[in-house]
Amino acid sequence: MDLSEHIAINRQLAESACQRLTEEINKLGFAVAEIKHYPNYDDASFILIKDPYTGQHNLTCYWYDEFKKQRIGSLQFNSDGTFYAEYDVVKTHPGKLTWFVEGVTAWGKADSIKAEAKLLPMPG
């Protein structure tokens, strides 16, 4: 299977994962103008990575900043139908100023997608 086939086959799950990451970012309560980029499947760069366990090639997606220099997120599909995604936020929590939001993560499979924010305590 070539790259374009992997992109097409994984589209529905990828769009659900992107939506879940976006919901998790929005739950944090940032003002609309504070978040400049959200994960969008069509904005990703795509590559196939060989799974060392199964030998199959799995789709991996990367998101980059507006200058295409710094990676700000990734979405990895696994041979068993699961995925893991993370997307950078890198901002002080809007409602809890003693916490820093590193990013959000999502994982699971089509019928069960979980997500959470990655929070770090601010240096005191």
Predicted regions and their residues:
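Contiguous, amphipathic alpha-helical segments that mediate oligomerization or scaffolding
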Residues: 2-32, 36
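Ampiphathic alpha-helical segments that act as solvent-exposed interaction surfaces
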Residues: 10-11, 17-25, 78-124
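Amphipathic, interaction-prone secondary-structure segments
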Residues: 25-84
